[in-house]
Amino acid sequence: MDAVPELTLNNGVRIPQLGYGVYKLPPEETERAVGTAIEAGYRSIDTAKLYRNEREVGKAVGASGVPREELFVTTKLWNDEHGYEAALAAFERSRGELGLDYLDLYLIHWPVPSLDRYVETWKALQKLLSDGSVRAIGVSNFQPVHLRRLIEQTEIVPALNQIELHPQLPQEELRAFHAAHGIATEAWAPLARGSMFSNSTIAGLARKYGRTPAQIILRWHLQRGTIAIPKSATPSRIAANFDVFGFELAADDIAAINELDTNHRTGLHPDGM
């Protein structure tokens, strides 16, 4: 089994560069799927309050036989849980659902600029970090304007920003902002929900390397220094998505994938929340 490379977050905590996401996995399928992922070698599991499957993720983690300290568990607070006290309560609910003593990473799922409470919410996450309830704190779907406010008005720079990112939406400007401020970039929908598998460039590279289109795209993420959290409920695809460490894309092939940028989103823009 290949070891997953790790990246070091800005507070020294290490995170696997490839994780397993459980978005839209029904609760009745989640425990099995997460167990399959852990058996395949994944050590990072990403869930959220919104997904309604935290309890099943926790059950799979507990039943895996893998020591807790070898697993990296992420969850996120939802939009109706913004505010200092509300965020603290949301964390305790999620920790209770997961059945874990601590979390590895806790994220604000969306900035919700119309609500404008993400700064006080972030201050609650800072308290959770200082209390030792979570090893690292970060955000999701934040734009530079949102990140800049957190940096200027609070004490801790987010360790990570989880954003939609794939070859059609490479997010170069946001990635540059992250790099300048020591914020790790994590990709949700790293495979663009499968919409690029028939793309001629991706399909051609899959033939060239004898790999699946998904493996080509995931390899692109890894070689660019992005953390990727693909999701699948199919055991064979869960395993195939993990099998991306035995080859490397040539520099010109990375460049060819970089040219596929169309600024296409498969999900919502943060300003629309």
Regions found by a protein language model. Give the residues of each.
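Beta/alpha (TIM)-barrel catalytic core signal, keyed to glycine-rich beta->alpha loops juxtaposed to Asp/Glu
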Residues: 111-273
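Glycine/small-residue-rich loop that forms an oxyanion/phosphate-binding "nest" at active or ligand-binding sites
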Residues: 76-122
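Alpha-helical scaffolding within the catalytic cores
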Residues: 2-7, 55, 59-62, 90-93, ...
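N-terminal binding-site loop/beta-alpha segment at the start of enzyme catalytic domains
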Residues: 1-71, 192, 256
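Acidic-and-aromatic substrate-binding clefts and catalytic sites of carbohydrate-active enzymes
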Residues: 25-28, 48-56, 80-85, 113-116, ...
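Acidic (Asp/Glu)-rich catalytic clusters
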Residues: 10, 58-68, 92-101, 129, ...
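A structural motif
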Residues: 42, 100-103, 134, 158
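Short, acidic/polar
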Residues: 25-37, 83-98, 145-147, 169-170
